[in-house]
């Protein structure tokens, strides 16, 4: 029937993997912050046993192109293609700590299906910046985290950007603009 086809329509989006959870021998549930649907949970069947699929496509912090279908309130991934991975972050424990903190914060603060394309683009840019940035001391790491949290507070309407700008020196303001 046409109603059944409508339910199983393939939808495509881009998303950054927030976390993954293995649910049985072969399947994984992943939480994704997507560009077009906000935060969603989706199941990907058979990925852990597949010899054809790239298993790293579901690793947290990776940006992927996702083809999926929605049935009721559940998403099932049909196909994923790795679009971007942040290699320099994965090689540096300090960057990994910051990156996973960012992912966890996004996961805890953003509600399911809360679409924010502008914030999604900003998140990808933040990870690009973290990937390029050399962290030379702990203070830099904490400054980045503080700026990120302030950015989230602005996005969530807790602070106005003009209020936050008064707290920064010129040097810190440059970092803040990137994050």
Spans of features found by a protein language model:
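Short, Lys/Arg-enriched N-terminal segments with co-localized hydrophobic residues
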Residues: 1-7
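Non-catalytic alpha-helical scaffolds and adjoining flexible linkers that form interface surfaces
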Residues: 8-28, 33-38, 42-179
